[in-house]
C-alpha cells in the first residue's frame, strides 16, 4: 500500500 512506500521514504 501507499503507506509502505511512505515508510521507505522516511527511512531515507
From Swiss-Prot:
GO biological process: chemotaxis; defense response to Gram-negative bacterium; defense response to Gram-positive bacterium; innate immune response; positive regulation of chemotaxis
Effect recorded for residue 7 to A: Important increase in antibacterial activity, important increase in helical content, and no change in cytotoxicity towards HEK293 cells
Keyword terms of this UniProt record: Amidation, Antibiotic, Antimicrobial, Chemotaxis, Immunity, Innate immunity, Membrane, Pharmaceutical, Secreted, Target cell membrane, Target membrane
Chain positions found as Leucine amide: 12
Subcellular location: Secreted; Target cell membrane
Organism (species): Polybia paulista (Neotropical social wasp)
Protein name: Polybia-CP
Free-text tissue specificity from the UniProt record: Expressed by the venom gland.
Phenotype when changing residue 11 to A: Important increase in antibacterial activity, important increase in helical content, and decrease in cytotoxicity towards HEK293 cells
Major localization listed first in the record, in broad terms: secreted
A GO cellular-component term linked to this record: membrane
Consequence recorded when altering residue 1 to G: No change in antibacterial activity, complete loss of hemolytic activity, and complete loss in cytotoxicity towards HEK293 cells
Keyword Membrane in record: yes
Effect on the protein upon substituting residue 4 to A: Increase in antibacterial activity
Result when mutating residue 7 to K: Important increase in antibacterial activity, increase in helical content, important increase in resistance to protease-mediated degradation, increase in hemolytic activity, and weak increase in cytotoxicity towards HEK293 cells
Family: Belongs to the MCD family. Protonectin subfamily.
Temperature remarks: Is stable between 20 and 100 degrees Celsius.
Function (record text): Potent antimicrobial peptide that acts by disrupting bacterial membrane. Is active against both Gram-positive and Gram-negative bacteria (B.subtilis (MIC=15 ug/ml or 4-16 uM), S.epidermidis (MIC=8-16 uM), S.aureus (MIC=15 ug/ml or 4 uM), E.coli (MIC=8-64 uM) and P.aeruginosa (MIC=64-128 uM)). Also shows cytotoxicity towards HEK293 cells (32 uM). Adopts an amphipathic alpha helical conformation, that may allow to partition into the target membrane. Also acts in inflammation since it is chemotactic for polymorphonucleated leukocytes (PMNL).
Amino acid at each position: 500500500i501507499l503507506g509502505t512506500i511512505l515508510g521507505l521514504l522516511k527511512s531515507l
